[in-house]
Amino acid sequence: MMDPNSTSEDVKFTPDPYQVPFVQAFDQATRVYQDLGGPSQAPLPCVLWPVLPEPLPQGQLTAYHVSAAPTGSWFPAPQPAPENAYQAYAAPQLFPVSDITQNQQTNQAGGEAPQPGDNSTVQPAAAVVFACPGANQGQQLADIGAPQPAPAAAPARRTRKPLQPESLEECDSELDIKRYKNRVASRKCRAKFKHLLQHYREVASAKSSENDRLRLLLKQMCPSLDVDSIIPRTPDVLHEDLLNF
């Protein structure tokens, strides 16, 4: 934070807005407004200016001066809760650099204008310029923050398949009987395949264990021999995907 006695051109860090020419402050706020997505040619309806004493006492909440643009005059009372000031000064929506506190929704629903001493929804101290776009007196107050996206359409529900008969007695047609027999044959085929595959794995595991003992014996008898080329290693887990078939 800068020295209050400094004559820097950076108006965003000036502790007292009354010491800054309004044109300079308005131009600075306009640049911030346009950088944040505001219309490049539209004038600012109002400017919220942070009051930052030097040094900022610990725990002190930041207050803001409100200015009506482009008249070039500051409102006399600092606003400690600028996120609600738009209702009092006909600005439909603030356009802040930082996030707005959650308590603003409660005040917005009640339609109450903020008082100068109200600290219920004060934002943390921030040396930034705030701008509020589109202050038409007759315009309806808009919700603060980014527009909410439209809710996504719910996916269509799947139609449930009719229950398949579990016995020949439940079959109502020749087609149902044929499908039932095919399902029974398929289940038997899968069960037989899994049984044979499991038996193969057990035999291969025993063979792998025998190969390991033989490999160790050959290495002890002839250390220079490339045993792995003679007796290849067998993976510990065989056909795991097929077992889950």
UniProtKB/Swiss-Prot annotation:
Subcellular compartments: Host nucleus
Single GO BP term: symbiont-mediated perturbation of host cell cycle progression
Entry-annotated residues carrying Phosphoserine: 167, 173, 186
Stretches for region Accessory activation domain: 229-245
Induction: Expressed in the immediate-early phase of the viral replicative cycle. It is expressed again during the switch between latency and lytic replication.
Residue span of region Basic motif: 178-195
GO function terms (MF aspect): DNA binding; DNA-binding transcription factor activity
Positions of short motif Bipartite nuclear localization signal: 157-194
Domain (bZIP) ranges: 178-228
Sequence segments annotated as region (Disordered): 140-167
Keywords: DNA-binding, Early protein, G0/G1 host cell cycle checkpoint dysregulation by virus, Host nucleus, Host-virus interaction, Modulation of host cell cycle by virus, Phosphoprotein, Transcription, Transcription regulation
GO cellular component, one term: host cell nucleus
Site (Recognition of methylation): 190
Region (Leucine-zipper): 196-228
Modified residues (Phosphothreonine): 14, 159
Protein role: Transcription factor that acts as a molecular switch to induce the transition from the latent to the lytic or productive phase of the virus cycle. Mediates the switch from the latent to the lytic cycle of infection in cells containing a highly methylated viral genome. Probably binds to silenced chromatin and recruits host chromatin-remodeling enzymes. Regulates this switch by binding to 2 types of ZEBRA response elements (ZREs): the CpG-free AP-1 like elements (latency) and the methylated CpG-containing elements (lytic replication).
Entry text on domains: Recognizes the CpG methylation marks through a specific serine and a methylcytosine-arginine-guanine triad. The leucine zipper region contributes to homodimerization. The basic motif is involved in specific DNA-binding.
Assembly information from the UniProt record: Homodimer. Interacts (via b-ZIP domain) with the DNA polymerase processivity factor BMRF1 (via N-terminus); this interaction may inhibit BZLF1-induced transcription of the BMRF1 promoter. Interacts with human UBN1, CRTC2 and RACK1. Interacts (via N-terminus) with human PAX5 (via N-terminus); this interaction inhibits BZLF1-mediated lytic viral reactivation. Interacts (via leucine-zipper domain) with host CEBPA; this interaction induces G1 host cell cycle arrest.
Record's protein name: Lytic switch protein BZLF1
Species whose genome carries this gene: Epstein-Barr virus (strain AG876) (HHV-4)
Phylogenetic classification of the source organism: Viruses, Duplodnaviria, Heunggongvirae, Peploviricota, Herviviricetes
